[in-house]
Amino acid sequence: MLSCRFQCALVLLSLAVVFSKVSAAPSDLRLRQLLQRSLAAAAGKQELTKYSLAELLSELAQSENDALDSSDLSRGADQDEVRLELDRSANSSPLAARERKAGCKNFFWKTFTSC
């Protein structure tokens, strides 16, 4: 009798183990699917991050180019004004070259001599 009860308990225990493994198999599959989905989502986020980074860099480069273009235009206008002022100062000499003193035309090492 004792052996019969022991055999029945052993059979019930083995059946419980088999059913637990069978019921655990789909959860492993579910876990694998969940893991694959999360990895795919992470890869999608990484691609999105790369896209966002590329988009950000292109916008930054575009704004930098726009700023450089506008500063080039303002520099060009400033240079035109400077050239105009230099032309005025060169043309507005009150005395002709003959009327200047001889010492004022001579220069030594980038400086004019005293007149």
Curated annotation (Swiss-Prot):
Cysteines engaged in disulfide bonds, as pairs: 104-115
GO MF annotation list: hormone activity
Domain of life: Eukaryota
Bias (Basic and acidic residues): 75-88
Region Disordered: start-end pairs: 65-95
InterPro entries: Somatostatin, Somatostatin/Cortistatin_C
Gene Ontology, cellular component aspect: extracellular space
Signal sequence coordinates: 1-24
GO BP: any one term: regulation of cell migration
Primary localization: secreted
Propeptide positions: 25-88
Localization per record: Secreted
Keyword vocabulary terms for this entry: Cleavage on pair of basic residues, Disulfide bond, Hormone, Secreted, Signal
Family: Belongs to the somatostatin family.
Stated role: Somatostatin inhibits the release of somatotropin.
Full protein name: Somatostatin-1
Lineage, highest ranks first: Eukaryota, Metazoa, Chordata, Craniata, Vertebrata
